[in-house]
Amino acid sequence: MPPKFDPNEVKVITLRATGGEVGASSALAPKIGPLGLSPKKVGEDIAKATGDWKGLRVTVKLTIQNRQAAVSVVPTASALVIRALKEPPRDRKKEKNIKHNKSVSFDEIVEIARTMRFKSFSKELKGTVLEVLGTAFSVGCQVDGKSPKAVQEAIHAGEIDVPEE
């Protein structure tokens, strides 16, 4: 027999979900079924929580305590960069490997870096900004009309100042 269920125990499950969509509850079932939760209801909660991330893949953190699931969205750097581009959501099933060609301002990149600070391994905000610029390069967008690589080189050369925190 499995051990008795402790109502005060907190379980944390992280999974990737597409924003605004109810994922296949069959994928959720093995993870949350043993905890006494309905996969269908949790799937709807995830869809509600990821509503403003329509069409983007985001990491979702499920905190389960006392048979209640709290859903929180942990956005990735690429999701934040794409969101900053303010492009309309595209159909993921039809278009694969989308290259984004709009431009993001450097101030928005710094704001994204501040948001991502808790996940970054860098010591200073400057390092996190460089990480986000690398993500912007892989997404295929520009920063203030220039290539993210050129902006990175300008930061290394000291031409662009990154604020301390």
Curated annotation (Swiss-Prot):
Pfam families per record: Ribosomal_L11 (PF00298), Ribosomal_L11_N (PF03946)
GO molecular function: large ribosomal subunit rRNA binding; structural constituent of ribosome
UniProt keyword terms in alphabetical order: Cytoplasm, Methylation, Ribonucleoprotein, Ribosomal protein, RNA-binding
Quaternary assembly: Component of the large ribosomal subunit (LSU). Mature N.crassa ribosomes consist of a small (40S) and a large (60S) subunit. The 40S small subunit contains 1 molecule of ribosomal RNA (18S rRNA) and at least 32 different proteins. The large 60S subunit contains 3 rRNA molecules (26S, 5.8S and 5S rRNA) and at least 42 different proteins.
Protein task: Component of the ribosome, a large ribonucleoprotein complex responsible for the synthesis of proteins in the cell. The small ribosomal subunit (SSU) binds messenger RNAs (mRNAs) and translates the encoded message by selecting cognate aminoacyl-transfer RNA (tRNA) molecules. The large subunit (LSU) contains the ribosomal catalytic site termed the peptidyl transferase center (PTC), which catalyzes the formation of peptide bonds, thereby polymerizing the amino acids delivered by tRNAs into a polypeptide chain.
Entry's family note: Belongs to the universal ribosomal protein uL11 family.
Official protein name in the record: Large ribosomal subunit protein uL11
Organism for this UniProt entry: Neurospora crassa (strain ATCC 24698 / 74-OR23-1A / CBS 708.71 / DSM 1257 / FGSC 987)
Record lineage: Eukaryota, Fungi, Dikarya, Ascomycota, Pezizomycotina
